Regions:
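Histidine/acidic-residue-rich, glycine-tolerant segments that coordinate divalent metal ions
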Residues: 57, 91, 113, 127, ...
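Alpha-helical transmembrane segments that form the membrane-embedded catalytic/substrate-binding core
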Residues: 146-150
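Acidic/His- and Gly-rich active-site-bordering loop/insert found
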Residues: 2-139, 163-164
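A generic secondary-structure micro-motif detector
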Residues: 1, 22, 171-175
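Predominant activation on well-ordered alpha-helical scaffold segments within soluble catalytic domains
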Residues: 29, 33, 151-155, 183, ...
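Flexible, small-residue-rich helix->loop connector segments that border functional cores
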Residues: 152-165
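Short low-complexity stretches enriched in small and charged residues
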Residues: 58-66, 152-154, 181-187
Length: 228
């Protein structure tokens, strides 16, 4: 477990340096993929993971091109980039144990925000050298931590798969900010047969560090309109 925690901390600090806003999370998707590609999970990318026609608030073609060029410069391989360069970012990972049991789903968001990160001595990422390398973009809402926790969970399930039953689906979701990305995965059918669904957020309520709060209510609803 200590190894998983240490790996999660390292991944979180790496992801924190490369924040990408919704539907442009190409480097992020690649970094997550590299962490989980050698597990027993079946991985789905691009149009296999999300329905592009169900996405809301997509970036412009110019923004997507800029993001793909940045990802290419980072070192994202062509095969991976070709699957996600059109805004079909994120990963869906599935483990079917082959043993009868419930289908459990987990969702971890991966996008950053259009915020310039502080360069102050009171800001730990700046002081310890892992602040954002992308001007005007920042992980200001903890999604770098969420993605890292999701990867750690996936690795834990994989390491203990012989003791499990049922099916596990883990969604590394693009474009949570603005509530734009979830519909693409929903319409793809990933949740159709899920019996239990879990998602989480770090620091959502003011509790002592290390405390888990099982429920939040009263402020998570939303309604969207398409204005033509």
């Amino acid at each position: 477990m200590k190894t998983l925690i240490d790996e999660a901390k390292t991944l979180r600090r790496t992801l924190h340096q490369y924040p990408e806003v919704g539907f442009t999370e190409m480097i992020t998707t690649y970094l997550i993929l590299k962490e989980v590609e050698n597990t027993s999970f079946t991985l789905y990318l691009g149009s296999d993971a999300t329905d592009i026609n169900a996405q809301m608030g997509r970036p412009s073609e110019e923004e997507l091109l800029k993001a793909s060029e940045r990802a290419e410069s980072f070192g994202v391989d062509k095969d991976t980039l070709d699957k996600i360069r059109n805004g079909e970012t994120g990963i869906v990972a599935v483990l079917d144990t082959g043993v009868e049991g419930p289908h459990v789903g987990f969702r971890f968001d991966i996008d950053g925000l259009p915020i310039t990160e502080a360069e102050k001595d009171s800001h730990i990422p700046f002081v310890e050298g892992f602040k954002s390398k992308h001007d005007g973009e920042m992980h200001a809402c903890g999604h770098d931590a969420h993605a890292s926790i999701g990867v750690a969970l996936l690795k834990y399930l994989d390491a203990n798969k012989d003791e499990l039953k049922g099916k596990y689906t883990i969604i590394f979701q693009a474009a949570e900010e603005g509530l734009r990305g979830a519909n693409g995965y929903v319409q793809k059918g990933w949740l159709d047969t899920v019996d239990y669904f879990f998602t989480s957020h770090v620091g959502l309520v003011p509790l002592k560090v290390g405390t888990v709060n099982a429920k939040s209510k009263g402020f998570l609803s939303s309604k969207k309109f398409d204005v033509e």
